[in-house]
């Protein structure tokens, strides 16, 4: 058996990121059941960075992650992790109060813009006009290169003398 200060089980993106962080504080062994890391959930990740998605706790984690994703450490990745995207939440014209409630829930700190019915239709011409209300646009939402991010954590773990054990 190998000696380790930390044993992390699961080498998907969550396990790899935890192992990378912990490796700054001691010897880490990262165990993966599959023949390669990221075989399951990481490979099917939605790959969207949004500060408006999910409950308040998830939104707080997203906001806290932005700086790292925008400026990962030198040598962590070969190209930017985030790419341009933006998101649009389309309101129901029969129930405009739901969009109002969402905007209020997100609060003044949310980086969203209220778009008119016409703006939403101009941006997404395939929308049916009769089913489209006003919208909330989040221009800061980004695509995440999940593979590059995952590989950066694994490379960083090895660079900190951590060990990945597959087929464990």
Named regions from a protein language model:
Residues 40-46, 127:
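Short, flexible, mixed-charge acidic loops at enzyme active sites
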Residues 136-168:
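Helical element adjacent to the flavin cofactor pocket in flavoenzyme catalytic cores
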Residues 34-36, 120, 153:
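Short beta-to-alpha linker loops that shape the active-site pocket of alpha/beta-hydrolase fold enzymes
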Residues 10, 32, 91:
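Short beta-strand/turn micro-motifs composed of small residues
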Residues 23-42:
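Glycine-rich FAD pyrophosphate-binding loop
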Residues 1-14, 29:
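Beta1/beta-strand and adjacent pyrophosphate-binding region of the FAD-binding site
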Residues 19, 23, 156:
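Gly/Ala-rich phosphate-binding loop of Rossmann-like dinucleotide-binding domains
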Residues 46-123:
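Dinucleotide-binding Rossmann-like beta1-alpha1 core, especially the glycine-rich loop
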């Amino acid at each position: 058996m190998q000696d380790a200060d930390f044993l992390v089980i699961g080498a998907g993106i969550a396990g790899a990121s935890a192992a990378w962080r912990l490796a700054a504080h001691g010897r880490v062994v990262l165990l993966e059941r599959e023949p390669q890391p990221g075989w399951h959930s990481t490979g099917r990740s939605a790959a969207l960075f949004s500060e408006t998605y999910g409950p308040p706790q998830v939104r707080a984690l997203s906001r806290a992650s932005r700086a790292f994703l925008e400026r990962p450490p030198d040598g962590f990745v070969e190209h930017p992790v985030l790419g341009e995207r933006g998101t649009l939440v389309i309101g129901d014209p029969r129930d405009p109060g739901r969009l109002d409630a969402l905007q209020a829930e997100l609060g003044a700190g949310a980086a969203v813009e209220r778009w008119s019915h016409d703006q939403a239709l101009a941006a997404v011409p395939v929308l049916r006009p009769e089913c489209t209300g006003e919208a909330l646009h989040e221009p800061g939402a980004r695509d995440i290169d999940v593979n590059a991010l995952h590989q950066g954590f694994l490379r960083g773990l090895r660079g900190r003398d951590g060990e990945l054990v597959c087929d464990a």
